[in-house]
């Protein structure tokens, strides 16, 4: 699952954003990708042109439900303090891939989730 498809918070634009490359890479591995974004879902839908392996969600927790990993791509404020127990209990594998390094790794791990911050040592 992916939280955040817009190229930056506050925008509905997805062009040249990192989410597009991630989605394409996942599709190349035959992965169905579930995405939440507060503004960019219409633009993402146009970009995907009806691709059957892209599922768009109005609710971030529905996007993450049963997911084997959740990648934070755009650091929208609504993602800053998620309900960690809800994520842990609903995900297939509670793995958080923090592409913006906004979460405290020790705290997330202490909540019972796996954590990897992209670019962290």
Model-derived segments and spans:
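Structural/interface elements that position substrates and couple domains in central-metabolism enzymes
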Residues: 1-121
């Amino acid at each position: 699952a992916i939280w955040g498809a817009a190229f930056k918070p506050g925008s509905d634009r997805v062009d040249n954003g990192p989410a597009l490359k991630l989605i394409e890479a996942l599709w190349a591995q035959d992965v169905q990708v579930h995405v939440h974004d507060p503004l960019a879902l219409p633009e993402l839908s146009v970009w995907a042109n009806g691709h059957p392996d892209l599922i768009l969600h109005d609710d971030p927790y529905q996007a993450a439900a049963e997911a084997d990993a959740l990648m934070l791509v755009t650091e929208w404020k609504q993602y800053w303090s998620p309900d960690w127990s809800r994520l842990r209990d609903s995900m297939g594998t509670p793995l958080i891939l923090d592409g913006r390094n906004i979460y405290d790794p020790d705290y997330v791990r202490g909540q019972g989730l796996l954590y990897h911050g992209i670019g962290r040592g």
